[in-house]
A protein has these predicted regions:
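Glycine/aspartate-rich loop-and-adjacent alpha/beta segment that forms the canonical ThDP
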Residues: 232, 238-297
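N-terminal capping segment at the start of a domain
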Residues: 27-43, 194-196
């Protein structure tokens, strides 16, 4: 994978700045952003944001057709991304800012009163990159289905991406949307599950087992791709495979195997950091494990 050959859909000025960094560099900086944002706000969800960092870094900086400088809320003429697991807003905001949708300095306003960067993404204050407010868990896949149908009816051949959580997949609306997408042959819909095995109350297998998740999605009529959600090459290959099947009549589900709190040793692999802000000492510890590459906000 050409880790320095970042998406040409991003504005030329921004490419000149960001192209000096590999996807690994960007991913490390995004993780630092997440830790600092949640610490500064004394609130937020670091665990799942850290587990999905590599997934969104590859998508926004390598695989998705988007342009921050000509962004439209209706997504016309470009790929669209929806964050169904809205509590993962720290990673979403960081990736948007680092992509050039809004100033990186604005990350410091996360969860502040009057900020455009609320705990769950909203459209009230017109934050570029956010097409729709995140609702209750389970709703985003349905929204993405609607966007995919709209693009088909409009004659567009762009892709629609949506990120869901594995805990979120316990919601019934996910499976209603799964049936809808398969029935309507939404082959340009690419859903991603951050499969970290943890949710707010504990391991997903203990709270409510999803069983054989791969077999389940296949049984619902989806093409299923399983990948290591922390291997940048594997993530890129998964996206490419999903896009290559755009004419096969099947929606795509990429099951990304990840670790909650990835790359921060005391957060990694435990549900205790699902929605907990690190204190000053914990933040310093976490940042010592994450290389500053592009520069902190």
């Amino acid at each position: 994978m050409r880790q320095n050959g970042l998406s040409l859909s991003i504005s030329i000025k921004h490419i000149i700045m960001i192209n000096n960094y590999s996807l690994s560099d960007i991913s490390s900086q995004v993780r630092r952003d997440i830790v600092r944002m949640v610490n500064m706000a004394a609130s937020g969800h670091p665990g799942g944001s850290l587990s999905s960092t590599d997934i969104l870094t590859v998508l926004f900086f390598s695989e998705m057709n988007h342009d921050p400088k000509v962004w439209r809320r209706d997504g016309k003429g470009k790929d669209m991304f929806f964050l169904s697991a809205g509590h993962l807003s720290p990673v979403f905001y960081s990736v948007l800012a680092r992509s050039g949708y809004f100033p990186v300095s604005e990350l410091a306003s996360f969860r502040k009163q009057g900020s455009r960067l609320q705990g769950h993404p909203s459209v009230e204050r017109g934050l570029p990159g956010v097409h729709v407010a995140s609702g209750s868990l389970g709703q985003g896949l349905s929204v993405a289905c609607g966007a995919a149908i709209t693009k088909r009816l409009s004659g567009e051949e762009n892709f629609v991406y949506v990120l869901c959580g594995d805990g979120e997949s316990e919601e019934g609306q996910i499976w209603e949307a799964a049936m809808f997408a398969a029935h309507n042959k939404l082959s340009r819909l690419i859903a991603i599950t951050d499969w970290n095995g943890q949710q707010i109350d504990g391991p997903t297998d203990s709270v409510m087992s999803l069983g054989d998740l791969e077999a389940k999605w296949k049984a619902f009529g989806w093409e299923v791709i399983v990948a290591d959600g922390h291997d940048l090459d594997a993530i890129s290959a998964a996206y490419k495979q999903a896009k290559a099947g755009s004419q096969n009549g099947k929606p795509k589900m990429i099951l990304m195997k990840t670790h909650m709190g990835m790359n921060v040793d005391f957060m990694q692999g435990t549900h205790h950091w699902h929605g907990k802000a690190p204190n000053a000492d914990q933040t310093a510890n976490a940042l010592s494990q994450l290389k500053e590459t592009i520069g902190d906000f």
